[in-house]
Structures are given as structure tokens and as C-alpha cells.
Design a protein with these regions (language model features):
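Alpha-helix-loop-beta-strand connector modules within alpha/beta enzyme cores
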Residues: 156-160, 215-234, 279
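Alpha-helical scaffold segments that flank or form the walls of functional sites
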Residues: 109-158, 179-198
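Active-site gating/metal-coordination segments in enzymes
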Residues: 167, 173-223, 252, 258
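Acidic, glycine-enriched loop/beta-strand segments at the rims
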Residues: 45-56, 69-72, 367, 385-390, ...
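Histidine-rich, glycine-flanked metal-binding segment
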Residues: 29-37, 45, 49-92
């Protein structure tokens, strides 16, 4: 994917014209100014559950100011607007990832020691190029300096909009607080609330010799977070922990249940409490998929996301053999199977709120951008129609974060948009046929490689 900057946007106008898009020179000169009135015309738009159009949308100051269908007086409405004719292509909202990690990966290594502003910007730009407009870094994330955080949060030139849970509580790397009694848990939450975070993250799991956070502690942490106005997302693996977390009032289960098949009691609890459920199926699949399917490396959609170091690793026959036969890979295959089984059961039951994410960026093989599109495919394979899977990744994912200004193509919404060369309602993998990505009304990425 070609990532646009002020320096190279003029170079790419030839590519735009070759692709059937001819923004005039005035728009090019005003690129990034935030003041240009822009019209995308002759484009089919995902409105609700249907792909409508072709029609047009107007964008002003980074937001959608009008959505026009074929019967509207488009000539009058488009007067004085800079026109981008998309020649019958398809428009969907940009995705929101409720569960990712930003700035932790460098080559084939991962960890907080890799976090720098430059590395964080690179990760956010990669998410953005793949159509993810908003990213929640759900734990393990150092607190950026105020200027860096402002760039990461509100400036499309630095990539997807950034939200964060900060370091989190009871993280497996041992670098975040591990409260042992309820009052400690409350104090830790109060301390975290003083930082520029958007959500509280808890890890409730067994990591080697580390015993999980006690129920008394996570109940206290959840209660304190709610008193301070924060939602709580919980890492979870077992059904037992998931049930206890839902009962304690956790707002979000940040992973699918993978140890056993879920039961009706759990389904009823999710519905009753309104708890969000983020399956993150690809998280475990990423452990082995690049070893099992070496032909993936020939896919340009993946190649664009790989660092040279990671590409070399995936290309190694020795690495593939060692990885594919490892105990970790075998366990991951079992977890994916159970996760999909439970996801299908929840979809069939209905009434459960799904969030979206793939835990991309936590480990090198969980590749930002590619991971989210693969996760969409898992949602469909588990039983969601493509239009509903896209709804999970857009409107529902925004709703999980209480972001009412994005996730839909509608007047007043942020112009965070993906232009596609094929209809994703026909085949969910058509979300990978990216023609352009817009964020807050700015063209930020052009084309599928």
C-alpha cells in the first residue's frame, strides 16, 4: 500500500488518474488543510445492512456533511466541491480495533522496550493503510509524551487514531501492577486513572507460575474503575473466569473462551449484563498459520505488512518446521477450534454484543492490518453474514468505545472511510481489495499492493 504524506501526494496523482480518480489540482494543493469541501461521487455506499447507490457523499472539515442518493439533486449539492469520481466502487466505514497493541514490535522482537514515538507512528500508519481508523492499545503500552499522544490520537498524518489502556493490571510480562488484596487493586485503579488512558485492562489468566488475579481483587478493581467512569476490559481464557468476570461487571471480555465449550448459563449472562465479547480468533491462529501456509508469503496483501526481518523468518524452512510441530502451535490449533465453536454458538444464540480485534501487535506474528482482515473472515466462517461482520468491525466496535462520531456512513460522522474495488457483501475477503483509505477527510493510503 502507498502511504500518503504531504511530500508524496503530488507524485500519486498519476496513480489516482490511472485508477479512474481525478481529483483536481485545487484539492491536491489543499491536501491536509481540513478546509476543502470534497465530494466522492459515483460510489456505492454501505448504509445500514445494504450497499446502496451509486450515489455521492460530501465531506467538509473531516466529517460527512451529506449523503446523496441517485434521486437527489446532486448537481446543486456538489457545486463548489472538489470531485473524486470513484466509478462505481464500494465505500464502507473504516474499521475500529478494540483489541490491539501499538509500538511493541520491531522486526522479530516484541516488548515494551521497543516502544518509541517513531515505532508507534509506524504501527499506527500500518493499521491505517489497512483500513483500521481507530485502534485501542489494550495494555502493555507505555504512556506517550503529551505531544506524541496528541499526534497519535488526532492527526491522520501519524496513522490510525490511538486509544490506550496504558500498562494494564496483572500483565504477564511482570511490568504492570499485580495487586494481592482488594484495597491494593482499588489503589492501582486510582493511580491508573490519573494517567491519560481511555479504558482499564485486567489480565485474568494463569501465566506459568504466576497465579491469576483473585476474584476479590478483580471485583474491587472493576468496581473502582466504574466509580471513576472507566470501562473494564479483561483478558480471559477459561469459561470459569469468564463467568466470574461477567458476574463482577466487567464490560468487555477481550478474548473468546477457549478451554471448554460455553454453556447456556454463560450465554444468558452475556445477554443479561450486556457484556461485550471480542473473539480474537486470529490471535492464536497467527501462532502457526505462516508455518502451515508458506504460500501466504506470496500474497501482496500480506507482504506489505511484513518487515524484512519477519519475512526472512517466515521464509525459513527450518523455522516453519520447528514452529508447525511445536507444542505451542498444537495448543493454538486447539484453542482456535474451541474459540470458533464457541463463537458459532454465540452467533446462533443471538443477542450477544461482539467487539472487534485480533490482538495485533502483541507478538511479531500478529501482524497489524492483515490480522484484522483475517479476523473478519473468521467471523463470517463462524456464521455471521458479511454485512454483519463488517458491522461488528465498524459500528459495533465504535459503540463498544462509546464513540458516536464514527463507524457509519451518515451525516455528521467522521470521514474515516475505505474505498474498495469489489463488493465485500459478496465475499468478505473483498475488504482486502482496498482502493483508497480516507481518515478525517484526508486521503491517507492508496491502493492494494
Amino acid at each position: 500500500m502507498t502511504k500518503l504524506t504531504r511530500r508524496n501526494v503530488n507524485t500519486l496523482i498519476g496513480t489516482l488518474i490511472a485508477g479512474g480518480i481525478a481529483p483536481n489540482s485545487a484539492y491536491t494543493r489543499n491536501y491536509g488543510s481540513g478546509g476543502t469541501r470534497l465530494a466522492m461521487t459515483n460510489i456505492r455506499m454501505l448504509i445500514g445492512q445494504e450497499m446502496s447507490g451509486p450515489g455521492a457523499i460530501l465531506i467538509e472539515n473531516g466529517t460527512i456533511s451529506a449523503v446523496l442518493n441517485e434521486t437527489d439533486n446532486t448537481a446543486a449539492a456538489l457545486q463548489n466541491a472538489q470531485i473524486v469520481d470513484y466509478q462505481g466502487r464500494y465505500l464502507i466505514p473504516a474499521f475500529t480495533s478494540n483489541h490491539a497493541h501499538v509500538g511493541l514490535i520491531k522486526g522479530t522482537t516484541g516488548g515494551r522496550h521497543n516502544f518509541t514515538p517513531e515505532n508507534a507512528y509506524a504501527a499506527l500508519r500500518q493499521f491505517q493503510a489497512y483500513g483500521i481508523g481507530t485502534v485501542v492499545s489494550l495494555g502493555l503500552t507505555p504512556t506517550p509524551e503529551p505531544k506524541t499522544r496528541e499526534h497519535m490520537r488526532n492527526n491522520p498524518q501519524y496513522g490510525a487514531s490511538f486509544m490506550t489502556a496504558g500498562a494494564g493490571i496483572f500483565a504477564p510480562d511482570g511490568l504492570s501492577p499485580r495487586p494481592q488484596i482488594p484495597e491494593e487493586a482499588r489503589q492501582v485503579v486510582r493511580q491508573m486513572a490519573q494517567q491519560p488512558i481511555d479504558i482499564i485492562k485486567l489480565w485474568i489468566d494463569t501465566f506459568g507460575p504466576i497465579q491469576p488475579m483473585s476474584e476479590d481483587c478483580f471485583r474491587a478493581a472493576i468496581d473502582e474503575a466504574h466509580q471513576l467512569g472507566f470501562a473494564v476490559a479483561a483478558h480471559v481464557y477459561t469459561l470459569d473466569h469468564a463467568k466470574k468476570l461477567v458476574a463482577a461487571g466487567a464490560d468487555i471480555l477481550a478474548h473468546g473462551v477457549r478451554d471448554v465449550e460455553i454453556d447456556q448459563e454463560f450465554i444468558d449472562a452475556l445477554r443479561e449484563k450486556g457484556t461485550w465479547y471480542i473473539p480474537t480468533v486470529h490471535m492464536d491462529e497467527a501462532t502457526y498459520i505462516f508455518a502451515d501456509q508458506p504460500l501466504l508469503l506470496e500474497n501482496p496483501f500480506l507482504q506489505s505488512a511484513l518487515s524484512p526481518e519477519l519475512k526472512d523468518q517466515f521464509s525459513s524452512a527450518e523455522w516453519r518446521e520447528k514452529t508447525a510441530t511445536s507444542e505451542r502451535a498444537q495448543k493454538a490449533r486447539q484453542d482456535v477450534e474451541m474459540n470458533l465453536r464457541n463463537l458459532s454458538k454465540l452467533i446462533e444464540a443471538g443477542g450477544v454484543k461482539f467487539g472487534f480485534g485480533a490482538d495485533a501487535g502483541a507478538f511479531p506474528e500478529r501482524i497489524p492490518g492483515f490480522a484484522e482482515h483475517r479476523e473478519l473472515e473468521h467471523l463470517v466462517n463462524a456464521g455471521l453474514p458479511p454485512v454483519q461482520a463488517i458491522g461488528v468491525a465498524t459500528e459495533q466496535a465504535a459503540a463498544l468505545l462509546k464513540l458516536t462520531d464514527r463507524g457509519k456512513i451518515a451525516e455528521g460522522q467522521r470521514a474515516d472511510l475505505i474505498v474498495l474495488d469489489a463488493n465485500p457483501l459478496d465475499d468478505i475477503t473483498n475488504t482486502r481489495k482496498i482502493h483508497a483509505v480516507w481518515q478525517q477527510g484526508e486521503l491517507v493510503s492508496l491502493g492494494t499492493p
